[in-house]
Every structure is written in structure tokens, then in C-alpha cells.
Amino acid sequence: LLEARSDEEVSKLLQECGYPPLDAARPEEMDAALSQAREELLADLSDSAPDPRYIDIFKLKYDYHNAKAILKAAAVGTSPERMLMDMGRVPAVELKTAVESGELDGLPGDLPEAVAEAKSVLDTTRDPQLSDIVLDRWMYRDMAQVAEVTGSEFLRGYVAAQIDAANLRALIRTLRMGKNGDFLAGVLFEGGEIEPAAVLALANDRSGLAEVYGATRFAQAAEAGEAALKGGSLTEFEKRCDDAVSDYLAGAQMIP
């Protein structure tokens, strides 16, 4: 889908994958169809999983996405409805009510502390990027805790891969924006296989990208990132990051 050259091509690809005919002139229909498919998939997986926490680790990112949308909408006095995705551990409408009322204690995992801190940062700084970083940091911490409780080494590795992808994205975006290492240090996350210090060092010496990432699953993503820094496609870089995480998940079929 990322490589599709037009909305019409996206619509055709979706139909080939079993989606109903979609009007390319109405991209909101495509978004709705994709969201519905994801909701149905997560529901099916939840019903068949021996431990719901195996699925929670994939659902909780939607809780944090919704929290971001709700907080930012409240800050500017608009409705977050069109941005909400009902695929998290908490129904979107319930999360909206909890965040707007400040009654957070009933939320699962680290969400109460995460929302409270992000709201405080947003109220103080009026900078939604900073509040998003707070929520992302809590999200990866939440994911790591869920993985740890399940005892699944595979899920621990999945969380680490997600963090490594996020840190590589942060590095390339920081360099493209011409920001310095101080900025990058504030947006890197702990918990990946690649230490934040190693990523931070690349802010001053990007020639080390191949050395840091060459022997990892992110080798191709790093190559695409280096190309993006020279005027290449950022979309291709993002796709390579996603592919690296997807390749890791593909190994799940080998887990007994």
C-alpha cells in the first residue's frame, strides 16, 4: 500500500486482499475499512489466545494513540472523535470520558500515570510534541511490563524491536531537521537491543550508521535512512523500519 501510486491503486490492492469495493474519491472509506479489518482481527485473536496479555501488547498502542488525540483535542477545544481508534484495551469512548474527567484510576497498566504526566506537560508547555514523547515513553514501558509478565522471550524481543525502530526513526528525523544531539537525547527510548548512547553518537558521526546497524535486522532500514538524509525517500525509510519489525513478527510461526 505504501508503494501505491494513486488512491485508485490503493483501492484495487485492497479489493485483491478481500476488501469490498471502495470509492477512491473517498479515502475516509478506505481508512474505515482498514480500521474495521484490524478490529475484527484483534477480536478474533483475543478470542483464541490462551492468555489475553499476548494480545494486549499489540492493543495497548491504540490506547496511547487515543490518549494523545484526546489530550490534544482538549487543549485546543475540538473533538477527537475522528482520530480515535477503537482497538485498544479500553473502548475509545471510555478512555475519552476518563481523560476528560480526570478519573484515571480505572484505566489499565501504566495509562493513569502516563495520561496524568502527559497532561501536566501539555498544560505547562503547550507543546503537543513533548506530551507525545511522554506518552510514547510510558507506552514502551507498559509494553515491556506486559511482555515480562507473560514470560515470553519472543514478546520481549518484539518490544525491543519496536523501540529500536522508534530510535532509528528519531535519529533520521532529527538529522533531517538539522537538530543537534541534545534534541535527540530527549526523544530516545531505553529498552531496545541498540543502546541509546550508540544511537546518540550517530548524531555527530552519521558515517557510523552501517557499523551500528549493519549486523542487525535494521540494516536495510539504516541504508534507506542514510539515503533519506541525502534527499532520498523518507517513505522508503519508514517502510524499511516497518518491514524489520514485521520480519521479526513473522518468526512467531516458529514459536511453539
Model-identified regions with their sequence ranges:
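Extended alpha-helical surfaces
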Residues: L1-P256
